[in-house]
Each structure stands twice: as C-alpha cells, then as structure tokens.
C-alpha cells in the first residue's frame, strides 16, 4: 500500500534510487590546460568554442538541456498518460505523491524521493510495460522531474493567466540552462512587474484532509541524506569514507553509458542550481533544508533551534552570536560530541546512530549532530536568517502532510479525495519562486561588468518583493556576495 514519503520503501540499496543518483552526476570536465599552453594560445572566441567542442561532457550537457525547452513535451506527463490508459485507478497513488510533493521543500532530497517513488509506482503497478533504460536511453532526465513536480507543477490547479505561468517556467528553464552550461551571464529577467501584481487571498488547506492525516509515519531519510552527499564537498568537514566507497561501488556497477562521474560535486543535478560550489563556509546545497525534508523529528528540532536562537536573551546580541551560543548549549546538554569523537570516518556512526538525547523540547541524535557539525554556525545563520530559498522552504513545508498518513482502511478514501478535490495550493507564489531562483543563480556567477549592473538592478526590486511577501531576512545584498 503506497503511503508516500516512506523511507522504509526507499532503502539506500534500491536499484531505482541509485540509478537516479548516477544520472544526477555530471561527467568530469577535461583538465585545464597548463600555463605554458595557455600562454601561447591567444584568448579569443574561436579558441573558447574549440575548447568547448572538445569537452568530454558537451554531448551530455546538450542532452540534459533538451528537457529545458518550453516547446518540448513533458515526458512525465506522457508517462502518466500512458499509465492512465492502462489503469485509471493508478491516478489515486499518483495524486497522493503530488499532494505530498506540494508541501515538500525544494531540496535535492525531496526531488530524489519524489522521482524514486514515481518510478517505483509505475514499475510495480505496470510490470507488463518496459520502463527500463529511461535514463540510459535519454527518454527522461532528472530535469523532467524538476519541471513536472517543482517548477511548472503540471499536476496543480489550472491558473487563470496561462501565458504568465508559461513565461515563468520558461525563465526557470533559462536560469538552469545558463548555470548548467556555466555561462558568464544570467538571463535578464525583470521582476519589477511582479511588485504590482495583485496578491490573491491565500486559501487554507482542506481541514477534512487534515483530519485524515493523523497517523505518524516511522519515516526518516537522514541515512539517505548522508548516502547521497557522502564523498562530496557538501560534507567536506565530516568524512564518510566507507559509505562513499559503498555508494560509488553500487552506482558504478549499474549498467549505464557513463564512463566517469564528477565525484566531489555529487548528484548536483538534483539541486535547483546545478552547480557545486562552496563559499565562506556555506555550500550550494543547504543541509538544513535537506534535514527539514527528512522527518518530522528533524523538522521539529530545527523549529526548536530557530525559536531558541530568537529567544536566547533580551540583550541586543548579533544573530551570529545567538546561533553560536545556542548550538554550544545544545551540544553541552546532549553530550553527543563526547561519544562521537574526531574520527577519520563517520560511516559506522551513521549506521549505528546509537547516541541520542531527548527531552520535552527536542530530540538530537548522532545524525543531527553531524549535520550541525558540518554546517557550523555560519551555515545555521545563513539558513535561518539570510537565504530566501531556505525561508521559502520553511514557508512551504507542512510536516503533518509530509510525515503523516491515515489508518490503513482509510488511505484509499484519502487518495480518492485528494484526486477529486484537485487542491494543490502553492504556498509561495510562482513568481516569488522565480525571483528566488534568479537570486541563487547570481550567487554562483563570476562577476563581470555586465552582470554586476544586472545584479544591482535586480536586488532593488528583489528586496521590495521579499518585503511584500513577508520574507524577513538579512539584506540580500550581503547574502548574494558572501554565501551560496
């Protein structure tokens, strides 16, 4: 019985899951020419094009970019249509998946869960249809899942302004393509028009559905979180050598057309901005957003952590000091750091997860401790107070929907109700997501005269847009320059 967001159904040894992970790695870039070579070769556009043409992953990038064309069919919609022709009742499981996705944060972990559960649903229900080789034969790419579930949201209610919705999706695609191809410029998207957009009154989630989602699931995806990012620069301060070897051995044994993968970047194509970078103790993948999507226990801990920082004392301390003091107090109270000492490999600690502290306020175990150790004070500060994507994720997530289910005898009724009500409400407006996506792209682009002017113009309108939608964060001008 499909329940959605179920970690027990997605073990890290799942072949479907690892296949998706494999095709979310990029092929390594060719080595940079030596200084001697570059000194004798004049830098001009012809040489740059020639170097690009010789790139080992050019064909891969071209193929990945196909899904980022607005006039190309949605492959996920095509698969859904094929499944419905075979069995119309399949839509009930699909509707539950979409409903859970609707209240999930936009994180790599969320996308991995959604795409894996989708492929499991179609393979288990339709064994007579050959769905093998979807990635191998370039029938789908991970960007098909990006667009279908998180960008265009093909499953959601019909909007009144179809053309604006189409243009927003078009702009999202252009942003991803420019970062994927590592272009020097970001698409020039003017967001000033959104400042005068009439805000629709927010609808609330159906209370009837809320009443049905009362049974907590024993779901937790932290082991998967460590697995997917082990051996990458996302965990550059917490080594997982054995876990990394296990993962690389598993995915390299899969039948594929990939001869090599960019190990340190990890499955970066799962991220909203498919570009792996670290800057001032932050990474382009926020581990706290990932943790928020892992379980209700972890969501509640982050909620407690944020409130503790806000309530730390009545003096006018800087937020970074509040963060540091609160984390130090939590570590001192839980004592987990005394058990999980400095190790050269934390893989065993992940699988054992034998140390835990719990009281009336929060639960903290080895998994959360190691994530906090990796993110550090700056990472926590950025997540709670600086990054608009993190705040949008905090506004979007609904733990009662994501991590709860219903009694086994009622789950089919729940799926039918979700399907026929067709209420997939967007918590954060689509144009706000677009502006945030553009902001994240500006964080990773190399500054030049042209895009510096573009960023300055954008930030004026972006700051006003955030205020209009009640995003209370540190000045984005600081964040865009110092963090990723």
From Swiss-Prot:
As for subcellular location, the record says:
Host cytoplasm; Host nucleus
Entry's Pfam families?
Herpes_env
List, alphabetically, the PROSITE patterns matched: HERPESVIRUS_UL32
Which InterPro entries does this chain map to?
Herpes_env
Provide the residue positions that the database annotates as binding Zn(2+) 2: 286, 289, 383, 390
Alphabetical GO CC annotations of the entry are: host cell cytoplasm; host cell nucleus; viral envelope
- Disulfide pairs here are none
One GO MF annotation is: zinc ion binding
Residues that coordinate or bind Zn(2+) 1: 74, 77, 148, 154
Where is the region Zinc finger 2? 286-390
Q: Which UniProt keywords apply?
A: Host cytoplasm, Host nucleus, Metal-binding, Zinc, Zinc-finger
Regarding protein family, the annotation reads: Belongs to the herpesviridae UL32 protein family.
- Functional summary from the UniProt entry: Plays a role in efficient localization of neo-synthesized capsids to nuclear replication compartments, thereby controlling cleavage and packaging of virus genomic DNA.
- Provide the protein name: Packaging protein UL32
Query: From which organism does this entry originate?
Result: Human herpesvirus 6A (strain Uganda-1102) (HHV-6 variant A)
Q: Which gene encodes it?
A: U36
């Amino acid at each position: 019985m499909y329940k959605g967001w179920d970690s027990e159904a997605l073990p890290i040894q799942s072949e479907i899951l690892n296949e998706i992970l494999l095709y979310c790695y990029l092929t390594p870039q060719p080595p940079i020419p030596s200084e001697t070579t570059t000194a004798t070769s004049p830098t001009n556009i012809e040489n740059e094009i020639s170097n690009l043409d010789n790139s080992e992953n050019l064909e891969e990038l071209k193929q990945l970019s196909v899904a980022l064309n607005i006039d190309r069919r949605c492959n996920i919609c095509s698969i859904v249509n094929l499944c419905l022709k075979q069995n119309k009742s399949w839509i009930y499981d699909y509707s539950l998946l979409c409903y859970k996705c609707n209240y999930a944060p936009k994180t790599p972990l969320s996308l991995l869960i959604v795409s894996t559960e989708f492929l499991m649903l179609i393979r288990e229900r339709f064994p007579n249809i050959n769905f093998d080789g979807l990635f191998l034969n370039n029938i789908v790419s991970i960007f098909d899942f990006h667009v279908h579930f998180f960008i265009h949201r093909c499953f959601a209610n019909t909007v009144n302004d179809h053309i604006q919705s189409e243009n927003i999706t078009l702009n999202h695609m252009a942003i991803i393509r420019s970062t994927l191809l590592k272009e020097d410029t970001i698409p020039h998207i003017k967001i000033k028009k959104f400042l005068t957009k009439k805000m629709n009154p927010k609808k609330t989630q159906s209370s009837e559905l809320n009443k049905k989602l009362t049974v907590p699931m024993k779901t937790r995806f932290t082991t998967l979180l460590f697995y997917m990012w082990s051996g990458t620069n996302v965990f550059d301060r917490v080594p997982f050598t054995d876990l990394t070897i296990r993962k690389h051995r598993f995915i390299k044994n899969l039948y594929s057309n990939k001869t090599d993968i960019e190990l340190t970047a990890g499955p970066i194509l799962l991220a909203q901005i498919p570009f792996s970078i670290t800057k001032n103790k932050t990474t382009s993948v926020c581990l706290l957003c990932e943790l928020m999507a892992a379980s209700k226990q972890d969501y509640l801990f982050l909620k407690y952590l944020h409130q503790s920082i806000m309530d730390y004392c009545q003096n006018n301390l800087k937020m970074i000091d509040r963060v540091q003091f609160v984390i130090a107090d939590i570590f001192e109270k839980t004592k987990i750091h005394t058990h999980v000492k400095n190790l050269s490999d934390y893989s065993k600690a992940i699988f054992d997860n034998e140390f835990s502290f719990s009281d009336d306020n929060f639960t903290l175990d080895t998994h959360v401790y190691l994530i906090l150790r990796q993110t550090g004070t700056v990472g926590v500060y950025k997540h709670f107070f600086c990054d608009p994507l993190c705040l949008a994720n905090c506004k979007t997530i609904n733990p009662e929907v994501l991590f709860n289910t219903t009694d086994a005898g009622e789950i089919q009724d729940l799926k039918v109700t979700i399907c026929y009500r067709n209420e997939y409400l967007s918590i954060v407006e689509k144009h706000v997501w677009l502006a945030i996506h553009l902001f994240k792209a500006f964080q990773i682009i190399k500054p030049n005269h042209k895009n510096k002017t573009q960023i300055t113009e954008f930030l004026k309108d972006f700051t006003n847009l955030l205020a209009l939608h009640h995003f209370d964060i540190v000045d984005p001008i600081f964040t865009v320059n110092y963090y990723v």
